[in-house]
Amino acid sequence: MVLNFLSPSLSRLGLWASVVILMVIVLKLFSLLLRRQKLARAMDSFPGPPTHWLFGHALEIQKLGSLDKVVSWAQQFPHAHPLWFGQFVGFLNIYEPDYAKAVYSRGDPKAADVYDFFLQWIGKGLLVLDGPKWFQHRKLLTPGFHYDVLKPYVAIFAESTRMMLDKWEKKASENKSFDIFCDVGHMALDTLMKCTFGKGDSGLGHRDNSYYLAVSDLTLLMQQRIDSFQYHNDFIYWLTPHGRRFLRACKIAHDHTDEVIRQRKAALQDEKERKKIQQRRHLDFLDILLGVRDESGIKLSDAELRAEVDTFMFEGHDTTTSGISWFLYCMALYPEHQQLCREEVRGILGDQDSFQWDDLAKMTYLTMCMKECFRLYPPVPQVYRQLNKPVTFVDGRSLPAGSLISLHIYALHRNSTVWPDPEVFDPLRFSPENAAGRHPFAFMPFSAGPRNCIGQQFAMNEMKVVTALCLLRFEFSLDPSKMPIKVPQLILRSKNGIHLYLKPLASRSGK
């Protein structure tokens, strides 16, 4: 009886729910169509490659060889062209210095369509902040990258590198090529943990380290989410196994960072512990963050501390891994430059047992080779912005506020109008006389303008120490049967790893 009475009500309720859901879907679709129309109208003056009716350029971008496909598009469509991920997300893809300057000399925010996926892990740190809050954090963090702070890190870079090289001695004795990318990643994270938290893993045994596994997992899962349209919706993503795995990894990473912050704050309250911290041979990144204040005397909150630490770990780990790995690949590919770098490093080290801060500035040829490697294999091949005001480019074409910009660094660095013979490895491009007249936005491995990479000096110093010690211990050569296949993810990776042969050198230097 009761069921019979309720049945019409339940039916009506189900009908209304269906109508509401349908209306929401229609409104969402209408909103997306309006956005599509607005974006298409904004980019109407920019011709580009043909698009798929549903996926836009996404299918082309996800294929192997997509980086060189974009370079070919850049030759066909000078300055810039539209780039569509599906039918509702469209960027103006730029790869010309004057176009890059028009956008990157300003302080426009990062594109939310891409970088909002990072928020669950790294929070609102320097990478994703904009406006006055970004300026405040940038100012507070800048002292953490002063050369007086960076000087003691040279010994930390060397310590972690030598542990990796000892591991490579054993692998090299097998007379087989092996993938260096994973080991370089372990070393880079060990270094970063020492510089950030004041502690690392003395044996590089990160496979059993939950924090290391979480950071590695989060990086790969974020890339997977960006590449998969069905994962762009938060509600859908958190219901999937990958979404739940992402949340678990986030919790592990956050719990670790929160606990380290809590312990460090407690130590600073204890006078004896505070003196120990002050007497250490170096201050780590967390020490500096805990001490900074703005003009009003306000410190970073715990949430802000965690966001900046997590941002530093995210930005400083994979990018350095990519840069070092591709540099060693270039050294194997061009043995004549490898030998010149090695001779320079030997001359600088002399009778010393290890490198000093002042030695880094003397590595001129190694630095030129490193920059040429960054040109051909930029660690971050593509970055994104969202215009907060209109922009007019040098050729008179313009975009309105709200438009999305993709700076394709890989294509910019292979732009033949800027770089003659762009596929040729020529370190002398970066000699003082050749670099003097170059456009300031022609070479952007660390971005450029007011929102450039705050940690670029830290990264350059680390890569110099690591690569110099590598060249002192080993001669690197290619495995022709396992040449790397470039894959553009959050960083530039190789689909099949970077496999090299290593031949130990009879020298005590670098040990």
Curated annotation (Swiss-Prot):
Gene3D superfamilies: Cytochrome P450. Induction: P450 can be induced to high levels in liver and other tissues by various foreign compounds, including drugs, pesticides, and carcinogens. It is found in: Endoplasmic reticulum membrane; Microsome membrane. It is a peripheral membrane protein. It catalyses: an organic molecule + reduced [NADPH--hemoprotein reductase] + O2 = an alcohol + oxidized [NADPH--hemoprotein reductase] + H2O + H(+). Keywords: Endoplasmic reticulum, Heme, Iron, Membrane, Metal-binding, Microsome, Monooxygenase, Oxidoreductase. It comes from the Eukaryota. One of its GO terms (molecular function) is monooxygenase activity. GO terms for biological process: biphenyl metabolic process. Its cofactor is heme. InterPro entries: Cyt_P450, Cyt_P450_CS, Cyt_P450_E_grp-I, Cyt_P450_sf, Cytochrome_P450_Monoox. Its EC number is 1.14.14.1. Cytochromes P450 are a group of heme-thiolate monooxygenases. In liver microsomes, this enzyme is involved in an NADPH-dependent electron transport pathway. It oxidizes a variety of structurally unrelated compounds, including steroids, fatty acids, and xenobiotics. Belongs to the cytochrome P450 family. This is Cytochrome P450 4B1. It comes from Rattus norvegicus (Rat). The gene is Cyp4b1.
